[in-house]
């Protein structure tokens, strides 16, 4: 870990000389700040690359031809297609046909699958979601799978397979429009999707027969749709993306065709479906109170109610009240209720207000005030809700921009990105700078997480740092990779680990091990470690099997990092003070026992050895219980013992040398240990 500056008088010159001999500076190989998405060299083999908005409730496909972006309609003439898959006795249905028969076939009609993709079965969010779903979700090797009856047989489908079917439908729509095969696509995901969810989305594309060239964050794609013609001075925009199942906020700057994401936040389990469920629960209570019948376990009745709740919600965006009527709802009883906009807003106000927290977060992360924002861009069908618009506009004291279709903006931006990758004319000058949502790092001695790629770093990026061994003759180091905002590694999410072995025997702190994190444009992480002495290297690519974070985990980490920031800083400072003392004591001991020991008088040699050994013995007994102040006191005491001896050895030049080489001394104590 990085130790603080060491005052001149506190560092013995022998240590400085020793540090000069091994010079192990923490090294950072700064990666590219962003990526110019120029036409790929293999673009001629791609054919037409399509852009797909794979939504929780609806999906949309678009493409670029002759410099123009086109949103494609399905066979029903609709420009958005329900993300529904159904299995009947005779066939598989996808899109409108699947959604239209859900009330008669609830157990074999699958929707909201995006809420499950890339997550583990025992994840809290998965368990919460399946309570609302009429179809069966089971545990398949620790991952969720949907159980349906297909032609009389029970079959299991993973979320990737179901999403693959929806992507396949989008591919089919494009192929029918073009009259030729489509093999490559750009697909969008929520900005707060973690690595596992992104990987799972790419897998879904492969299942659909699509090579996913790029995973793009939804609000970033929407910003492209909004800002394509903005070539004047820098424009700062907030993209507020409230869809059917996910919520994202991104703060971007647009200048001369350069789109830079400055901050992103969100909630991968908040959207229009949640507003629907509140209405459903309300109607269930009303019906039970009137008729004494609980229909919550009746799948067909619940499917009917959900369908009508969604219709009512949509109607209330343009009128003050609506009538919800279902003939023969259950047991021959009709359902008939009036719902006002005021009642709908009252029921969902807590959820509407919850969307403002990530808005505040992106402003805070970007170091900006509300007044610095030039435009608010609304994306996602749920932004049509008047109360949502009102809360957001009141927050910024500014009207939101309504110049783009909230249902189509994301697919539009994805198509532009696809056009860039396939070399379409008119988009050559677009530069897209996206960011990673969470800090990535490794565990070092003392359990501290050392960050290599900070939260909100533009991607793709590559960062490297030199580490060393913690004990003499250490032959193997374990690289433990974590994701999160807490100071201690154990409080963050463990992504994976690997060993680098075969390190030649050497004193602690001598081997140089370069750890490199490479985060690609899709947010996929590769970690490698190289022994600089031997050139031996090991690496791991963090994939969906490694268990990246769920939405709840992300929220918990960020919230806990804020709540416990003071506690984290205290723990970090204590561990750093302890390691500074331990390294100093070992350094003195090694030098006295080494070549420099021959130049010392026997009494001085004995004094230094005794002082160093006393500290090391004290550390063995008090390493966990001592305070930061006690470690610092021990460090000062040891320094005061050592300095007069080294000053005497090197005479008046010691002070000057110490001044000149202050940075070198810090480098010695700055080595993180694995």
UniProtKB/Swiss-Prot annotation:
Pfam families according to UniProt: HSP70
Region Disordered: start-end pairs: 651-674
Compartmental location: Endoplasmic reticulum lumen
Q: Answer whether the UniProt record assigns the keyword ATP-binding to this protein.
A: yes
List, alphabetically, the InterPro entries matched.
ATPase_NBD, BIP_NBD, Heat_shock_70_CS, HSP70_C_sf, HSP70_peptide-bd_sf, Hsp_70_fam
What is the predominant subcellular site recorded for this chain?
Answer: endoplasmic reticulum
Q: Its GO biological process terms?
A: chaperone cofactor-dependent protein refolding; endoplasmic reticulum unfolded protein response; ERAD pathway; fungal-type cell wall beta-glucan biosynthetic process; IRE1-mediated unfolded protein response; karyogamy involved in conjugation with cellular fusion; post-translational protein targeting to membrane, translocation; protein refolding
Task: List the catalytic activities from the record.
Answer: ATP + H2O = ADP + phosphate + H(+)
**What's known about how it's activated or inhibited?**
The chaperone activity is regulated by ATP-induced allosteric coupling of the nucleotide-binding (NBD) and substrate-binding (SBD) domains. In the ADP-bound and nucleotide-free (apo) states, the two domains have little interaction. In contrast, in the ATP-bound state the two domains are tightly coupled, which results in drastically accelerated kinetics in both binding and release of polypeptide substrates. J domain-containing co-chaperones stimulate the ATPase activity and are required for efficient substrate recognition.
Position of the signal peptide: 1-34
- SUPFAM superfamilies according to UniProt: Actin-like ATPase domain, Heat shock protein 70kD (HSP70), C-terminal subdomain, Heat shock protein 70kD (HSP70), peptide-binding domain
Q: Which GO terms describe its molecular function?
A: ATP binding; ATP hydrolysis activity; ATP-dependent protein folding chaperone; heat shock protein binding; protein folding chaperone; protein-transporting ATPase activity; unfolded protein binding
Q: Keyword annotations for this protein?
A: ATP-binding, Chaperone, Endoplasmic reticulum, Hydrolase, Nucleotide-binding, Signal, Stress response
The ranges of region (Nucleotide-binding (NBD)) come to: 143-297
Q: Name one GO cellular component term.
A: nuclear membrane
List all Acidic residues biased stretches.
657-674
| This enzyme's EC code(s) | 3.6.4.10
Q: Where is this region: Substrate-binding (SBD)?
A: 416-516
Described by its record, this protein's role is as follows: Probably plays a role in facilitating the assembly of multimeric protein complexes inside the ER. Is required for secretory polypeptide translocation. May physically associate with SEC63 protein in the endoplasmic reticulum and this interaction may be regulated by ATP hydrolysis.
Q: Which family does it belong to?
A: Belongs to the heat shock protein 70 family.
- Record-given protein name: Endoplasmic reticulum chaperone BiP
**What is the taxonomic lineage of the source species?**
Eukaryota, Fungi, Dikarya, Ascomycota, Saccharomycotina
Q: Source gene?
A: KAR2
